[in-house]
Amino acid sequence: MPKTPNVPGTDRPAEKAAGHWLLAQLGKKVLRPGGRETTNWLLSRALGGQIDVVEFAPGLGITALEIVKRSPKTYTGVDLDPKAAEIVRGRIGDNPNYTVVNAGAQETGLPDSSYDVVVGEAMLTMQTDKHKLEIMREAARILR
């Protein structure tokens, strides 16, 4: 398989790569159930005013860029993959209120009751039922 530059997981053989990174290597860089239109519709209703937003598993930062264009008070991306976290940092620009942490969505290390909105586009579908529950509990913990 040809390697796509700047895509995490390119150091692993296809049979060992995470499904979303394998799709990214093949050119499918955004996983959006419902498509871009649905994502934009949801973001336009969820993101308004001075709110604090956390995004679980921002991947290559495509949705992160859409979020920061809406000027939230803060944006925090949480990605387990260090290369993905670095890519998202590059996309969101140099704003002290916009950060990316290298952590898992089930244990972010973020403070309790500190965010207004959690975004996690298509990331739960790739998790076991146990991990889905852990991620949802973490989201509930960090939401106000």
Regions found by a protein language model. Give the residues of each.
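A short SAM/SAH-binding and catalytic strip from SAM-dependent methyltransferases
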Residues: 117-130
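A generic alpha-to-beta junction signature in SAM-dependent methyltransferases
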Residues: 46-47, 92, 143-144
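A short acidic, Gly/Pro-enriched loop at the edge of an enzyme's catalytic core
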Residues: 106-118
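Class I SAM-dependent methyltransferase SAM/SAH-binding core
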Residues: 54, 60-107
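N-terminal, positively charged/glycine-rich alpha-helical extensions of SAM-dependent methyltransferases
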Residues: 1-22
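Class I SAM-dependent methyltransferase Rossmann-like catalytic core
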Residues: 17-36
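Conserved alpha-helix/loop element of class I SAM-dependent methyltransferases that forms part
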Residues: 32-50
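A short glycine-rich, Lys/Arg-flanked "PGG" loop and its adjoining helix->strand segment in the class I
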Residues: 133-144
